[in-house]
Amino acid sequence: MRILGIDPGLTRCGVGVVDVYADRSARLVDVQVVRTSPTAELHHRLLAVGDGIEELVERHRPSVVAIERVFAQDNLSTVMGVAQITGVALVGAARRGLDVALHTPSEVKAAVTGYGQADKKQVATMVARILGLDELPTPADASDALALAICAGWRAGMSRAGIAGTPTPTARATGADAASGAGPTAAQAAWLAAERAQRGRR
C-alpha cells in the first residue's frame, strides 16, 4: 500500500510518501516540505501548498492520504493555518477519490515509538529506523509526515488482519495480507492499547 502522509502547516507543510507491505515493513518513496512566505496573501499560500501536495499525488499515485487531525492549541493563528491546509488536502483527496486517514499526534507517536508522548527527536529516530534511513529525516515536518504515513499503513494492515477489529475505509482487504498472519510489533501493540484507551474515554 502506498500512503501519502501530510503534516499540515501554512508556512511549512511536510509531505511524505511511504510504501507499507503486508509484513509491516516500510520503504521511503519521497519526502518534501512545501514552504510559503508568511508575508504572502493567504489565498496564494493555500494555492501553493495545494499545488505542492497535488504534484506529489500525481507523481506517486498513493492509495491513501494520511493527515494529522487538528486539535486544540493556544496559538489560534497556528491552529487556523493547520485547519486551512487540512481542508485543502481533504478536498484534493476527495477529487481523486482517495481514502483518507486522520490521526492525532499522540496516535502517530504511539504507533511509531510505542509512547504517545514521545518528542520530535524520538519520532524522527524511529522513523529512520523503520524506513532504514542512514540519517534522521529533517526538518520535523518531514519526519512527522512520514510517521503519519507509517501509522496509517500499520493501522490499515492490522485492520485487514483482523487485529484492530472492523476495517476502516482506508483498509481494503487483500487475500495476501489477510493470509500473512503476522502479529503486531511492540510499537503497534502499544498504539492499539492507546487507541482502545482513547475510545474508552469517549
UniProtKB/Swiss-Prot annotation:
Disulphide bridges: none
Pfam families: RuvC
Gene3D superfamilies noted in UniProt: Ribonuclease H-like superfamily/Ribonuclease H
Biological processes annotated in GO: DNA recombination; DNA repair
Catalytic residues identified in the record: D7, E68, D141
Gene Ontology terms: cellular component: cytoplasm; Holliday junction resolvase complex
Cofactors, names only: Mg(2+)
Gene Ontology molecular function: crossover junction DNA endonuclease activity; DNA binding; magnesium ion binding
EC number, UniProt record: 3.1.21.10
Catalytic activity: Endonucleolytic cleavage at a junction such as a reciprocal single-stranded crossover between two homologous DNA duplexes (Holliday junction)
PROSITE patterns (alphabetical): RUVC
Family of the protein in this entry: Belongs to the RuvC family.
Annotated HAMAP family: RuvC
Function: The RuvA-RuvB-RuvC complex processes Holliday junction (HJ) DNA during genetic recombination and DNA repair. Endonuclease that resolves HJ intermediates. Cleaves cruciform DNA by making single-stranded nicks across the HJ at symmetrical positions within the homologous arms, yielding a 5'-phosphate and a 3'-hydroxyl group; requires a central core of homology in the junction. The consensus cleavage sequence is 5'-(A/T)TT(C/G)-3'. Cleavage occurs on the 3'-side of the TT dinucleotide at the point of strand exchange.
Name of protein: Crossover junction endodeoxyribonuclease RuvC
Species of provenance: Clavibacter michiganensis subsp. michiganensis (strain NCPPB 382)
